[in-house]
Design a protein with these regions (language model features):
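An N-terminal, well-structured beta->alpha segment
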Residues: 1-68, 94-95, 150-184
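Gly/Ser/Thr-enriched, mixed-charge loops and adjacent short helices
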Residues: 1, 109-242
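Phosphate-binding and adjacent anionic-ligand microenvironments
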Residues: 243-246, 282, 286-472
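Self-splicing inteins and homing endonuclease
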Residues: 147-150, 247, 251-263, 326-333, ...
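N-terminal small/polar loop signature for handling phosphorylated ligands or for N-terminal nucleophile
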Residues: 33, 43-109, 200-260
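Active-site nucleophile and cofactor-binding loops and adjacent substrate-binding regions
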Residues: 73-82, 266-269, 291-293, 314-315
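Buried hydrophobic positions in well-ordered alpha/beta secondary-structure cores of metabolic enzymes
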Residues: 9, 46, 84, 97, ...
Length: 472
């Protein structure tokens, strides 16, 4: 029997194995029971990405909600995650159910639940839903009615939130400036950003080179992640077309971004977050704090110090950053895994917003991303990051908790200045370098993150991190 577990971004499973209609109905019933117990009213926005059966899962979910007396606002087509968050807030809904596995391979699907404040559900919420769902597994504890009956009872409404979201985006992005950039490469990666990432640009007469613009549940045969190793076709397009000054891409559900500079160089998300933070303060004159996850580059910290701005360090998971955005405490918050949002926008990762912000920055500054990054290094110092997955033998996996409980006072030739156990174990060294060890909860793997001022020093730090994991 499947055990329902909500991870960092919801419950995910493999289609036809554990992600089946029966389990989807159980989880939906658990969400309905949670909302009713909490006294939440206002209905639930239901969306899905382009994966197989996404629309069918969404309709079955609406049937269960209707039987529980909860109204559904069912998206008429596959819809970006940040747009679902926007619609929750716009309609003052009780929450949102999103059928997506984000950047995971095509054989996966998932349920992401968002509460009424529009961000990712916090642990106390997901634990309650998880508990309710697992108590129901193996029993027919849900009710459902037909979609026709739900509609007659006023418990089902089909919606298309695209126009309202794009109209809101018009207020937050200087699209007129983007017109001056030259040609843009645009890559929605067969995902939900089709018609979102291109339409505002075309409406302004921006010259774009659009690829991967049709729905494909296989996402072209790769995980729908706009990371360097999965977008070789897009990088080649940008590199080989001299008219293109910037390439922008999103993942399958459009909550993550990918940026390719005009010369074909892929720019890591860590650097984009820091650049946009600096841009929002220096050019847009925005005020407030900044947030990053524990695994994200300290280049963000350096920019914060440069501008005299408070920094919040959070566990991994955008839900914690989203909470700070909803509380109006920060200008921008971001994660190294290519998620960010800004003050006044949805408290959820928005890859569409991120792409347009980068395009605006490049257009208004009149410089490439690479040039802007070098200038930022000149002001605040250089930071180089790396991440590796280290596989553990059964013997090492058994002793690893004891290793991170008894840490050295010196590693990689520098003393440990600070230990942070916010999410995993992070060692900040006296020379500004740092290491983070995060054990996977589902497999015998430690995620090793490191950062230093030079590639040589980073190699030393990462080597020391690997040796600590494997040898102690």
């Amino acid at each position: 029997m499947t055990h329902i577990t909500f991870g960092t971004s919801g419950w995910r499973g493999i289609l036809c194995e554990d992600f089946i209609f029966e389990n989807v109905k159980v989880v939906t019933q658990a969400i309905a029971d949670h909302l009713i117990a909490a006294g939440e009213k206002g209905g639930v926005v239901i969306g899905y990405d382009p994966r197989f059966m996404g629309d069918s899962f969404a309709r079955e979910s609406a049937r269960v909600l209707a039987a529980a007396g909860v109204k559904s606002f069912l998206c008429s087509r596959d819809t970006p995650t940040p747009v679902i968050a926007f619609e929750i807030l716009r309609r003052k809904a009780a929450g949102g159910i999103n059928f997506t596995a984000s950047h995971n391979p095509p054989e996966y699907n998932g349920i992401k639940f968002s509460p009424s404040w529009g961000g990712q559900a916090l642990p106390e919420t997901t634990k309650d839903i998880e508990k309710r769902a697992n108590e129901m597994l193996g029993e027919i504890c849900y009710r459902e009615i037909s979609l026709e009956q739900a509609a007659r009872q006023g418990l089902l409404e089909e919606i298309d939130p695209r126009e309202a979201y794009l109209a809101d985006l018009e207020k937050k992005i200087d699209f007129d400036a983007i017109r001056k950039i030259g040609a843009l490469g645009v890559n929605p990666l067969y995902g939900t950003a089709r018609g979102y990432l291109d339409a505002p640009l075309l409406a302004r007469g921006v010259d774009i080179r659009l690829i991967n613009q049709h729905r494909d549940p296989y996402f072209g045969g790769f995980p729908p992640e706009p990371a360097e190793k999965y977008i070789a076709d897009f990088i080649s397009l940008v590199k080989n077309d001299p008219a293109i000054k910037l390439g922008i891409a999103t993942d399958g559900d459009a909550d993550r971004f990918g940026i390719v500079d005009g010369d074909g160089t892929y720019i890591e998300p860590n650097y984009i977050i820091a650049l946009l933070f600096d841009y929002l303060v220096r050019v847009r004159k925005m005020s407030g704090g900044v947030a990053r996850s524990v695994a994200t580059s300290h280049l963000v910290d350096a920019v914060a110090r440069h501008h005299g701005i408070e920094l919040f360090e959070t566990p991994v998971g955008f839900k914690y950053i989203g909470e700070l955005i909803s509380q109006d405490k920060i200008i921008i918050g971001g994660e190294e895994s290519a998620g960010l949002s800004i003050k006044g926008h949805v408290p959820e990762k928005d890859g569409i917003l991120a792409c347009f912000l980068v395009a605006e920055m490049v257009a208004r500054e009149g410089k490439s991303v690479g040039q802007l990054l070098e200038e930022l290094y000149g002001r605040v110092g250089r930071y180089i990051t790396k991440r590796e997955n280290i596989s553990l033998s059964p013997e090492i996996e058994e002793v690893f908790p004891a290793r991170v409980a008894n840490l050295p006072t010196e590693i990689a030739g520098a003393k440990v200045a600070k230990i942070i156990r916010l999410d995993g174990t992070k060692l900040v060294l006296t020379d500004g370098s740092w290491l983070l060890f995060r054990k996977s909860g589902t497999e015998p793997v430690v995620r090793l993150y490191g950062e230093a001022a030079t590639t040589g020093r980073l190699a030393e730090v990462m080597k020391a991190g690997r040796e600590f994991i494997l040898k102690g």
